[in-house]
Amino acid sequence: MNSREIRQSFLDFFAGKEHRIVRSAPVIPAEDPTLLFTNAGMNQFKDVFLGKGTREYTRAADTQKCIRASGKHNDLEDVGRDTYHHTFFEMLGNWSFGDYYKKEAIGWAWELMTEVWKLPKERLYATVYHDDEESFKLWQSETDIEHSHILKFGDKDNFWEMGETGPCGPCSEIHIDLTPDGSGGPLVNVGDHRVIELWNLVFIQYDRQADGTLVPLPQKHVDTGMGFERVAAVLQGKSSNYDSDVFAPLFDRITELTGTVYTASLDSPSDIAMRVIADHCRTLTFALSDGAMPGNEGRGYVLRRILRRAVRYAGTLGCHEPIIYKMVEVLVRTMGDVFPELEKQQATVEKIIRAEEESFLVTLGRGTEIFNEVVADMKTAGSTTISGADAFKLYDTFGFPLDLTRLMAAEVGLGIDEAGFEHCMMEQKTRARMDRKGKMQMQDDGGEWQWFAPEAPTTFVGYDMLETEATLVAARVSGDKLLMVLDQTPFYAESGGQVGDHGTLETAGYRLDVTDTRKDGEQIVHVVTSAHDKVRDCAVTPADVSFDGVVSVKAAVDRDRRVATERNHTATHLLHAALRKVLGEHVQQKGSLVTPERLRFDFSHFSKVSAEELEQVEHEVNAEIRKAASVTKHADVPYEEALALGALAFFGDKYADRVRVVEVPGISIELCGGTHVGNIGQIGMVKIVSESSVAAGIRRIEAVTGAAAEALLWQEYRDLQEIKNLLKLKADEEAGPKIKELLEEKKALDKQLQESRLAGLLDRLAASLAGGEEVNGCRIMTERLDGVSGDELRQAAVALRERVPCAVGLLCGVADGKVSLVAFASDEAVKSLKLDAGKLVKEAAASVKGGGGGKLELATAGGKEPAGIDKAIEVFVASVKSALQ
């Protein structure tokens, strides 16, 4: 049977047993943001097992897409080195929700294995939990398995638990003996690849309490799982999952792309590389098809690690250009009918993978050079361990995940100081945290809180009103500010990217200007920066404000600022929806800043957003604004209910049990605690100001709305009119063609000037061409040329190395206070005399307190110390002579 027939026969078998054949859940668990990836078939039924959900059916079966590349289920570093580890796999499974139980589950499993798939009964073993006498007896009575092949094991092997508490129960596993002589009974559950588990039947019958006791469940469930790749290999008579027809098309494609042929060897480096690439391509394709994106944290970073491992392994096959994206079509062709999302998302997935490959290949070469330098230093010093600092530099500067550096180190017989790496990582996180704290935390150099009422959470009433009467709860001076807490307030405290409200607080004696509002736990803190004494009718410093007894406060939010902020906040929701519509559903919000003046929106995307795409996004947003739909706010919605409504929720975001949902019907629905307009028509219009990169895979759009957008358009119109006037264009003439013509003229003139300057520079170097010391037939040329840019020195060096058959030289100069060094070596000097311009310039650069490097024939360096140039020349000449001896 081929793999397609095996998968279908499983589903057909259980359809014949009155099971609902359900679709695989996405590998990105949409309703469980705490889980990185779907890693088992039961994930989509977790709510049923927990008693929180139901289904319209009581029997189900499917083939579930799974990824295990993080947490306790992490097979990443084992992939490629054995016959069975994968980061992506399919899990065939059947379930009973309070319907059939052990008798049917065991009987049907045996029927499928032995009667449908014709596996040899004498090679099969069944394991049961040592206290599960019911299952033990059912194996004897409901199947014709050899009774000596029914084995008992303990908690580690045959008791399943969802967590420390909750649903659990005994399980029964079916193993197959693949030893040549069928003597593998003693190898069951010892981790020997010759006797492997095929199917796990879990019988969920208990609820584990916090004290460890087991309470019987009112309903008993069945949850089974069988690795599709493993059973395909067994049924096809293969000793490795990778030798089945599941992987054969991928290996064929790798051979087409690299010229390397797969030989099914466990030890061959090229075969290991091909297994890794095939596995990782599957993981990436399925994850991206389900909406994941490579990134710098969470599941995004797991995917980026996987992709970079694949790219590096492709390099070991001699391929140093993007190829992983070219394998996606193989999966679409071989699995697209089973998983239609592959074909639907093919173009997007290919673009994402290609962009990631191209990005990493830029740094991979330089990072590998640094790694090789570190290895050379380690071996010279007699060390066998790469320092944590060096490993962290490769991670932080060149994007090498630690597991990639660990792999490369192992290939040359070195280890890594992983504790040192973690120390460097923690230091960086601490610095970042302190930096954020320094930027965000209010000054804390004042006195203690003065309390006027019992401490309690502040009630926020600002969704419904902008003014209210309140009572002062506490106050404190902090530097030149006064911090005030009220029992209730209409002031929105900064959170979720939306800045805090401004406004006034008025008491019987003071009018206080609030210029920021922050959260402190469950309390809202109003930051007062100026005050007016109403009794004396004069300005006072916030520190001079004093209160006595019960203080009534009239709190009033600056209406214009709030309304402008609301326009921009609702606009971010519309922008998010438009980006997902135009660019694809892989787009996810990664951050935002909403102020009265403008909005900033960070989102996941694999490449620069083109001008045409930005125009389309802006058009989509403004078209919706013109429809003037009402904005609906759903308050205090249970989290699960919000997800059922279709609200967007992403991994890594923390949500309360009850949430607020902001909906623009038919356009956008998001979990959001911010303030919004009542009707999107109030936004007026949105104008995108800029699009830029924030980090790898993260883009940023800045935009303005309403009056600010109108003002921007008028300014752009005035600028255009001024340009047309300067160019003496008629009203109906376009400025673009004329500007392009002028730029082309300027480019030609710049080129003439550059050629003229280079010719003059070479004339100045004529003496060096004629002179210069010769050693072993190689002329050594050095010259200092102040006032000449590094780029001009480089052009001169290129010209010089082509004019002298065998020469090596160093050109130095100081321009704008910066030292530039350019070393060159002619082809003859490189090939015959083994001179290395990169090494020579690096040694010379130390004299000017700088560094650099480059290729064998041409290299550059910079420095901070002009006084060291003469010394740099001496070092260069000495290094050349030493190399030529």
Curated annotation (Swiss-Prot):
SMART domains linked to this entry: tRNA_SAD (SM00863)
Major enzyme class: ligase
Reaction(s) the record says it catalyses: tRNA(Ala) + L-alanine + ATP = L-alanyl-tRNA(Ala) + AMP + diphosphate
Residues that coordinate or bind Zn(2+): 569, 573, 672, 676
PROSITE patterns: AA_TRNA_LIGASE_II_ALA
Function of the protein: Catalyzes the attachment of alanine to tRNA(Ala) in a two-step reaction: alanine is first activated by ATP to form Ala-AMP and then transferred to the acceptor end of tRNA(Ala). Also edits incorrectly charged Ser-tRNA(Ala) and Gly-tRNA(Ala) via its editing domain.
Cell location: Cytoplasm
Cofactor note: Binds 1 zinc ion per subunit.
GO MF entry, a single one: zinc ion binding
Any single biological process term in GO: alanyl-tRNA aminoacylation
UniProt-listed Enzyme Commission number(s): 6.1.1.7
Protein family according to the UniProt entry: Belongs to the class-II aminoacyl-tRNA synthetase family.
GO CC terms: cytoplasm
Annotated Pfam families: DHHA1, tRNA-synt_2c, tRNA_SAD
Keywords: Aminoacyl-tRNA synthetase, ATP-binding, Cytoplasm, Ligase, Metal-binding, Nucleotide-binding, Protein biosynthesis, RNA-binding, tRNA-binding, Zinc
Entry note about domains: Consists of three domains; the N-terminal catalytic domain, the editing domain and the C-terminal C-Ala domain. The editing domain removes incorrectly charged amino acids, while the C-Ala domain, along with tRNA(Ala), serves as a bridge to cooperatively bring together the editing and aminoacylation centers thus stimulating deacylation of misacylated tRNAs.
Matching SUPFAM superfamilies: Class II aaRS and biotin synthetases (SSF55681), Putative anticodon-binding domain of alanyl-tRNA synthetase (AlaRS) (SSF101353), ThrRS/AlaRS common domain (SSF55186), Translation proteins (SSF50447)
Cofactor annotation: Zn(2+)
CDD domains, alphabetized: AlaRS_core (cd00673)
Gene3D superfamilies named among the record's database cross-references: 2.40.30.130, 3.10.310.40, 3.30.54.20, Bira Bifunctional Protein, Domain 2, Threonyl-trna Synthetase, Chain A, domain 2
Protein name: Alanine--tRNA ligase
